[in-house]
Amino acid sequence: MSGEQKHQYHLVEPSPWPALGSAAGFTLFLGLTLFMHEYPYSIYVLMAGLFMVLATMFFWWRDVVREAEYQGHHTPIVQIGMRYGMIFFICSEVMFFVAFFWAFFDSSLYPDTGVWPPADIVALDPFDLPLINTLILLLSGCTVTWSHHALQHNNRKDFIRGIVLTIILGAIFTAVQAYEYQHATFGFTDGIYASTFYMATGFHGFHVLVGTIFLTVCLFRGLKGHFSPEHHFGFEAAAWYWHFVDVVWLFLFICIYWWGG
């Protein structure tokens, strides 16, 4: 990478991370598919794919941070492009969840057995752990907004506190959902209700994990003084992503846990 920026436009330099990220994503979803079909050793493929995805995220973020903080490549025009890129990325993620909701409503509004949920399924009580997780995520949306406002007012102490609280709440949400899965009375292969339930909520849980990692990166960057009230798009993008995760969970809670159960 060149250490000098002679223009304000975003010219992408050669990088291995897009290709490696694609290979990592393919391995992760291959492992997930094999795991769903209960192939032997599929868990190892799944774990390898997850490790590859996390490693790619780490090194790609490292390069982006270097370009922003040490090489001065993130000019105002580049930052505008990154904002559009993040918006389009979130829109593409919305389409993933639209597909899952479509599958769920198609199955629930016109069930083959005439009854929804199917008679052999004991649905989870929406006002037990799902409601607790809803309150946790809503609170985390407040803490990340508090952190953002603190940074805009150059209050670094509250900025850090807000990120830490959001990360803790995200970890608690993940732990509660894992506990819920462990104690559910139905498994992934127990019909269309179970498969759409686990695909939608599990994919959301993966997004919570990614968002928590995203905020953790922002925490370490904040501790190193990387953000200022004028320049903090890295954290702003993480906050957008976290709010997106919050909104998706509200739809999951209302449509799948409450109405669909």
Model-derived segments and spans:
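...captures the hydrophobic TM-helix bundle architecture rather than a specific catalytic motif
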Residues: M1-G261
